[in-house]
């Protein structure tokens, strides 16, 4: 920590390494291996964190970190090392330029289906388009020239339009799939643990990532299919008023629903519902808005409980897959073109 002129103590952020076998680790004397002196001039020593490291095909190592640039907003910096101990600065992959929030967090940088993705979590965003206030997770999709270490973004997308989704990280499965996890919570509700709850917070069901038409698609990992229990099917159901379907009940379910075009103003699914509680998912075919609302899920906290995102409808048709767990809901629209995620602490 460093004492400021006003007497405040501020932590200095540096990067260090530890060597171990998965259980026991030792910190070498060369730590820290990256400090402010390794950053471009004007970058902050107080905001330099969240390293994501990977091994390149030639055996060298790369790491992407986030830092605060001289303009007071985030940047993603790339470093490389031959041995994992001696690191050098390579380039700034992307700058916020005060367009996407302020400081950035939890960066990731990886190839996907012929494109290159820089994924990270902006803090303090203002609402614009599909982005909402506060913490978001966004992906810059583009190309990467390895010879010049130049990342060129082509598209920018929000990774989840729900309420609780942050701090994404990916890994490469042995079969080549890019698998993503995330914190199924957000900083704004970390102090609102339900009374009597012995734990708080979780991660999402791991998701496979692919790119189609310049956009990242997210689907639950295929391993989930192997653990399904009883399957129930309903076809060509005409819904009038409030309708319950036989065999569709419980707090743990993997639901696939296809909403067909029709003369209706809105369509609502009530999930984790009893006489006093429910979480609703409402589709408005006229505006193509999908709204997740947990206002009646049982939380007493004064936090965000409702959020909407625009989905692509085909003349009013919409396909939904919903992972309902005891304390969470994950929604995948149109085979993962959009997702919406939220925790629920329904009794």
List each language-model region with its residue ranges.
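Beta-rich accessory regions
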Residues: 138, 143-164, 169-347
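Beta-rich carbohydrate-recognition and catalytic domains
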Residues: 1-50, 55-99, 111-161, 184-234, ...
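Beta-propeller and closely related beta-sheet repeat lectin domains
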Residues: 49-52, 105-108, 166-169
């Amino acid at each position: 920590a460093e004492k400021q002129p006003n007497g405040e103590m501020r932590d200095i952020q540096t990067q260090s390494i530890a060597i171990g076998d998965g259980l026991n680790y030792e910190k070498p004397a060369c730590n820290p291996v990256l400090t402010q002196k390794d950053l471009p001039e004007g970058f902050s020593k107080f905001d330099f964190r969240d390293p994501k490291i990977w091994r390149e095909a030639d055996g060298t190592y790369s790491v992407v970190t986030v830092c605060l640039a001289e303009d007071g907003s985030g940047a993603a910096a790339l470093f490389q090392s031959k041995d994992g101990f001696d690191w050098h600065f390579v380039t700034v992959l992307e700058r916020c330029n005060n367009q996407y929030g302020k400081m950035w967090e939890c960066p990731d940088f990886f190839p996907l289906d012929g494109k290159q993705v820089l994924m990270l979590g902006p803090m303090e965003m203002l609402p614009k388009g599909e982005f909402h206030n506060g913490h978001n997770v966004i992906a810059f999709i583009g190309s990467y020239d390895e010879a010049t270490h130049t990342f060129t973004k082509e598209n920018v997308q929000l990774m989840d339009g729900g309420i609780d989704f942050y701090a994404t990280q990916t890994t490469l499965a042995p079969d080549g799939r890019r698998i993503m996890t995330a914190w199924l919570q957000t900083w704004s509700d970390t102090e609102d643990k339900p009374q009597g709850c012995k734990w708080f917070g979780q991660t999402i069901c791991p998701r496979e990532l692919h790119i189609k038409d310049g956009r990242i698609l997210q689907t639950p990992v295929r391993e989930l299919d192997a653990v399904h229990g009883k399957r129930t099917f309903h076809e060509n159901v005409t819904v009038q008023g409030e309708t319950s379907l036989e065999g569709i009940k419980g707090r743990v379910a993997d639901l696939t629903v296809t909403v067909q075009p029709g003369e209706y103003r809105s369509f609502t699914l009530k999930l984790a519902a009893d006489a006093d509680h429910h979480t609703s998912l409402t589709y408005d075919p006229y505006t193509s808005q999908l709204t997740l609302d947990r206002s009646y899920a049982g939380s007493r906290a004064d936090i965000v409980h409702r959020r909407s995102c625009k989905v692509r409808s085909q003349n009013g048709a919409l396909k939904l897959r919903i992972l309902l767990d005891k304390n969470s809901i994950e929604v995948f629209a149109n085979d993962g073109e959009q997702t919406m995620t939220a925790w629920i602490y329904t009794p």
